[in-house]
Each structure stands twice: as structure tokens, then as C-alpha cells.
């Protein structure tokens, strides 16, 4: 079947690769326009754009799915549109442009976590199971009927980046099987069931650690915003990113935010047991072991805020 693929970030690349290697033809790739990255703010193609170029697939780089983009997509004559984290909404008349409409690979167990940050919000909420869903795109945000779902347990130490990478691989296979079923006429989409939850895009504010919560909630927050937007706290008015942390269930309690070093472990108090800081990054410096950072802190009676 002739396809149009729309996607932008690294998480969408496995799906593009698997579809290209299948018996289907990816006739056009739609991705976001080149964006400034790095300290020099150089315009850089998206991961999907780079992969499409390597595969020899024509690309449409645009941030607006307007009339011009719709005409370009319609000219391809695709039977089906496939979206994986493109980064924009598909509206009419583009929604009806491919003969069989559009399907979307979403990294959650719909209807849970509809929105831009399903993996991050699932981890931040303390959930231990997530997954991938392939559904038919319609006007509502992630509300369409579902063709296929696969669950995946979330490891106790996995970050959002870890889980998203795993789901990108698992979801790519699920997506190809769904496209196969649609082409064969055997795929069936069923309405979503259950209470929906929303997963709005994470912001820098989501990364500020609130130590006045139990340790498991603090660790879930850190894992959920790693690598982006990143967890952080303020120590002596200096922002310190927290890349890795762990539970210390047997340690003596500390007041929320209180920092102490015991036996080489740098601990921060919560409303339950302390959390051990393993890897941190003070503002303007590279990531380092928390013990190395602590040796450079001159004030010992301090609180993380």
C-alpha cells in the first residue's frame, strides 16, 4: 500500500524504518521544518528528515499543514497516512485526503494519557505499566477508535527517555502489523473504553523537584522528566540538575529538602525516607557524581528548594 508518513523526533524513526522495509511504499515523509539547535543555533533537520534522506524518500518539511501542504500530500495519491509524533494537528481537508484516512501510533494505553507527553506523565504519576496504541485519527485529540494495543512494564529505574526508546521499537512493529491488516481488509478499530486522562506537554516548571512529598513521588518526578525537560533543585541559589537518584529506605529521616552526606552518600530529605543523589549537574558545569559536587559545596547547613 502507498503511504504518507508524518513524524519528527527520534522516537518516530523506528516506525519509518520498519515501514520502509515492509512491503508497503512510503511515498512521502512529512516532518517539521529544520530548527535551530545547539549553542550556535544552527538550523538542523529533524531525526526523521535525516533518516528519510538516507532512505531516499522525498520529504516535505513544514510546520503548517495548510492548503499547500495538503495539495502536496494529495498529489502523492497515498492510500493511507501514518503519523508518529509529527508535532502538529491534522485537520480537514487533510484528514480525509488519503483514501483510507490516517492512523496514529501513540505511546500510551489509550484512553489513558491523551496528549503530547504520555510517557512522561505516566511515569510521573507512578504508573508501572504503559504501552503503545495504534488508532484511527479523527478531529478529537487522540480520541479515535483503536486498532491495536500492546502493554509494556515500566522498570523501577527507567527514565522517560528509556521507556520512550523501548516503546518506539515495540510500537514500530505494532504499527506495521496494523498497516498490514488495513491493507488486507482485516483490521478492526474499536472505540476507546475507560476514563481518559490527559498528558499535556511538559515544561521547565515540571522539572522543579518538590521535596515536600514522599520519596517515591520525588523519584517518579525525576525519572519522568529525564532527559527532558530535566529535574532540578536550587542549592544556595544555584540551580542543580538531578540526572540520577535512588531510594534510601533504611536511612534515618531528614526534613524535606535537607541535604546531608552519610558514608559517602549525598542524601536529601523528603516526607518519607531520604533520596540519594547519584549524578547531578550544577549550573554551568558538566554532569558529575553527587559526591564530587558535595565536596565542592562550602556550606553544610543547607536545604534544597
UniProtKB/Swiss-Prot annotation:
Biological source species: Clavibacter michiganensis subsp. michiganensis (strain NCPPB 382)
Pfam families: Formyl_trans_C, Formyl_trans_N
UniProt record similarity statement: Belongs to the Fmt family.
Annotated (6S)-5,6,7,8-tetrahydrofolate binding sites: 108-111
Protein's job: Attaches a formyl group to the free amino group of methionyl-tRNA(fMet). The formyl group appears to play a dual role in the initiator identity of N-formylmethionyl-tRNA by promoting its recognition by IF2 and preventing the misappropriation of this tRNA by the elongation apparatus.
Name of the gene: fmt
InterPro entries noted in UniProt: Fmt, Formyl_trans_C, Formyl_transf_N, Formyl_transf_N_sf, Formyl_transferase-like_C_sf, Met-tRNA-FMT_C, Met-tRNA-FMT_N
PANTHER family: METHIONYL-TRNA FORMYLTRANSFERASE, METHIONYL-TRNA FORMYLTRANSFERASE, MITOCHONDRIAL
MF term (GO), any: methionyl-tRNA formyltransferase activity
Top-level taxon in the UniProt lineage: Bacteria
Keyword annotations of the record: Protein biosynthesis, Transferase
Catalytic activity, reaction form: L-methionyl-tRNA(fMet) + (6R)-10-formyltetrahydrofolate = N-formyl-L-methionyl-tRNA(fMet) + (6S)-5,6,7,8-tetrahydrofolate + H(+)
Organismal lineage: Bacteria, Bacillati, Actinomycetota, Actinomycetes, Micrococcales
GO cellular component, one term: cytosol
Enzyme class label: transferase
Name of the molecule in the record: Methionyl-tRNA formyltransferase
E.C. number: 2.1.2.9
Amino acid at each position: 500500500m502507498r503511504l504518507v508518513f508524518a513524524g519528527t523526533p527520534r522516537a518516530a524513526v523506528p516506525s519509518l524504518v520498519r515501514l520502509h522495509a515492509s512491503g508497503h511504499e512510503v511515498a512521502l515523509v512529512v516532518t517539521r521544518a529544520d530548527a535551530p539547535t545547539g549553542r550556535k543555533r544552527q538550523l538542523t533537520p529533524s531525526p526523521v528528515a535525516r533518516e528519510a534522506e538516507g532512505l531516499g524518500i522525498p520529504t516535505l518539511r513544514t510546520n503548517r499543514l495548510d492548503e499547500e501542504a495538503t495539495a502536496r500530500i494529495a498529489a502523492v495519491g497515498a492510500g493511507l497516512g501514518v503519523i508518529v509524533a509529527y508535532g502538529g494537528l491534522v485537520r480537514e481537508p487533510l484528514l480525509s485526503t488519503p483514501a483510507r484516512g490516517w492512523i496514529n501510533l501513540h505511546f500510551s494505553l489509550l484512553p489513558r494519557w491523551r496528549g503530547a507527553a504520555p510517557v512522561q506523565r505516566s511515569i510521573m504519576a507512578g504508573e508501572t505499566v504503559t504501552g503503545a496504541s495504534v488508532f484511527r485519527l479523527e478531529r478529537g485529540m487522540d480520541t479515535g477508535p483503536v486498532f491495536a494495543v500492546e502493554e509494556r512494564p515500566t522498570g523501577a529505574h527507567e527514565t522517560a527517555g528509556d521507556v520512550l526508546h523501548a516503546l518506539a521499537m515495540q510500537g514500530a512493529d505494532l504499527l506495521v502489523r496494523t498497516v498490514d491488516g488495513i491493507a488486507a481488509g482485516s483490521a478492526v478499530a474499536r472505540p476507546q473504553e475507560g476514563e481518559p486522562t490527559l498528558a499535556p506537554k511538559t515544561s521547565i516548571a515540571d522539572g522543579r523537584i518538590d521535596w515536600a512529598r514522599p520519596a517515591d513521588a520525588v523519584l517518579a518526578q525525576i525519572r519522568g522528566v529525564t532527559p527532558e525537560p530535566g529535574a532540578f533543585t536550587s542549592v544556595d541559589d544555584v540551580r542543580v540538575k538531578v540526572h540520577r537518584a535512588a531510594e534510601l529506605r533504611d536511612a534515618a529521616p531528614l526534613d524535606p529538602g535537607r541535604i546531608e552526606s552519610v558514608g559517602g552518600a549525598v542524601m536529601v530529605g523528603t516526607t518519607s525516607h531520604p533520596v540519594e543523589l547519584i549524578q547531578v549537574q550544577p549550573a554551568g558545569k558538566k554532569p558529575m557524581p553527587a559526591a564530587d559536587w558535595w565536596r565542592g559545596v562550602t556550606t553544610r547547613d543547607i536545604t534544597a528548594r
